[in-house]
Amino acid sequence: MRNSFCIFFLLWVTLDVYSGEKCLFTIGSDFIVTDTISKNLSDTSRIFNLSDVVVKGSNIITKSDRLILIPTSNMQKASSSAWDLLSKIKLPGVIVDRQNKNATTINGSNILFKINNIDATIADFLTIIPSDVKKIEFFDKLGARYNDSNISAIINIVTKRHTSGGQFGLYEDAALTTMSLYNSAYVKFNKANSLFSLSYNSKYRDYSNSYTDTYLENEDVEISRKGVESPYGYFLQNIDAAYNYYKNNFTFNIKFNYSTNRNTNQNCSQEIFDKKSLIGNSFRSPKDKSHSPAIDLFSEYKISSKQSLLFNMVGKILQTNYDYSYAENVNENNSHFEYGVEGKRKSLITEIMHTYSLKNLSWDSGLRYKYSDTHNLYSYDITNDFDSKDQNLYAYTQFSGNVKNIYYMGGIGINWVSFKEGGNSFNKVLYRPLGRIKYMPLDNFSMSYQFSMQPTIPSLSTLSGITKNLNRYEFETGNSALRPYDNIKHKLSLSWNPNRWYISLNYNIESAKNLFASGIYCQNGKSGYQHINFDSKTVRKIDFYTSFDIIKDMLFIDGYISYNYYKFKIEDETFSLTDYTYGGKIVFYLKNFSANISFNHNPKELFGMKSFYGESTGSVDCSYKYKRMTFSLGVWNPFKKYVQSSGFEYARNGLYKTEYFRIKDNANMITLGVSYDINWGKSYKARNKRLNNSDNTDGIVK
């Protein structure tokens, strides 16, 4: 009798914690069949098998298409926000860059952030109080809706809600050794079925010790340019105002956004050498200003307990002023090149989606239409104009379900893309099939295979026929003959979560034929850069991730390593690259104190004849939480003379070009952070907005 009561109690607690979550539901267009539920109710590894409920001593739960990570109360007590919480929880294959306020996958792919299934930003994560975070969902195998994007993973934070009262918070992160500031402020009010919110965030940089080193070699010249320390800075601002209304089976959401960007202090001075002899100097000064208002409308009508109809519309206007000035003196001969461009881009995205779910089967379908109109007016040394119109109609459908412990998903997307600029135009239909099968013989072990075909569409800048002189030795130009091509992707995955360990292994293969990529050639003694057509490409990536709880819920260590291989072929030429990336962190938290030591060596990436170099980072930081305030102190990139922020390399027979941008201010940077938050009100679980679109293309050909 006593044992029966204990089992009943555990079952009741588990179902209560998940508040009716044992059902079919959707996230975006990814249908999820709720399967075995695990909850960290004790530190033991004892398992109670209660129908389809499993209670186990781990806060990492493996689902059919995602991981669920449950933050412990100790993690929440030691964190200042949901963003801070991300660095204390084990996200397999995710690099959390605390300094630059960003997160990517091991191989550098983009991650989409969400809060309660609504598209969000890192600034939004800073507005979430840790105690309001119920769970963190991590998706690294996405469905048909995202098969036309460059998103490879999703981090969704599920939070508590408030029906009355409100929330207010401030966040400030400043460097003590240089001028680097990050500011954030927000306020939220709830009244009956309505929620009002207003937020502001900005990022300001004003460095004095940055420089760029370049080297150029072709058939006629061998020029190296040694960077002279120059100022580097920018100022980004973002304002959001939102209103949400929910009653019964209807939800309405409207969001206004206004963002500005000022890059007016990014000068580059260089000394020019012909082989080893100093022959002159150069000065480059790009300036960029932009502002963008946007509006996002969303509504959802729940037809029945099994069906929903959703609608989303996003409108955006982007205006940009860009000026590029270059001057050099070589052997007492002066030359100067300058151009300006005033750009305006108007875009509209509309989407409608229908969802339907049964006991062991889910199905959804949607239609999304994008339209954009871009105008670029050039001045000074470039007299061409660039006016384009592009359209994209994407229809998708997907089903998913399970048979016992085998989970399956299949879907297809069909694209119609249209582009017109002057006399150049194309219309093309693209197909985006995908499928996935996952086998879970144990609740803590899974293996899966996923296939997808993702077409790549050329950007506006690569299609532009405008030629721009970079200096007397180099130029770059667009290629109006480029056309979309198909990427074939395969992914094999294994994951195992025994007691204190978590282990994952992924093998990715990507291939394409008749594609376009970066190229270099020589014309009249000058090196030219242009996207050109290649015959084929092959990409192989193997990444391994592991984490271990040294002291459970207090001290853990994780690490990753990735092998990356690229090969591109054009006629009888082959370009290849093999590279490794690795990193890890040690995290300690106890009561209101936490400490974090991390390092990340970013990978190189080959795209045709051009290799890209990312920024490798390291940090040591700690924080202490006192009532509603949190104080943090950190050292970023310790024991370094400089930080290589970015770089690239072109290589071809007889042609070579390298460029490395380095910032001394980012080395040994000491930062101080202060945050304050307060909230009041009662909690409730609101309906989730599940459709989100945005136009992140600037459309300005620089």
Could you describe each region identified by the protein language model?
Residues 21-75, 99-100, 140:
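Short, acidic, small-residue-rich periplasmic hinge/interaction motif at the N-terminus
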Residues 83-118:
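Extracytoplasmic beta-strand/coil segments of soluble accessory domains associated
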Residues 148-155, 163-211, 234-237, 249:
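Outer-membrane beta-barrel translocator/receptor signature
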Residues 418, 443-490, 507-526, 639-655:
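Surface-exposed extracellular loop regions of Gram-negative outer-membrane beta-barrel proteins
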